[in-house]
Amino acid sequence: NNGLMYLFKQITYALSNQEIESVYNPGQATTMLGMLKYPDDFAKAQGLNQLWTKDTTATAVIAENTGFGVRQAHIIRKPTVKGTFSFIIPLKHIFGFCDDYDKIVYGFKHTLTLVRKTDDDAIFRSNAAGAGKVHIGRISWFMPHVDPAHMAKMQLYKTIETKVKRLMNKNTHVT
């Protein structure tokens, strides 16, 4: 399960070049976290869209491992060109702070750094299957963009300006 995360050895999230969180061995880390936080029926809905289905055995034999069979059927069944796949991984699956962070971030550059790993751990296959290769041709990052109405935007600018001035005054009065 969780095979896509095994394609990377490190994933880092940064705001304006300031590292917020870095996950080493995201395959193992997100698998352990997912086992603790996702209910057993998670794979029947949203989980399968991120290739999350629990294995029932340690083998890649469809007759023995129903989790492996479900993932394989999902990949093959998708209406895409043979040999291609597409999945959605929410940031909260990777980074712990995303689970409960609900603030709007204004004026910062967001950076997601993915360091690729070999395919050895990412491809779960039977002993009879040949070694595969995963080529990542494109990764898309969807970030919600809030564009408030003009009046709300003006109020937000005033609030930000007031807080910046207060912060600057605190810094100048420090002795």
Name these PLM-found stretches:
Residues N1-T175:
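Flexible assembly/topogenesis modules
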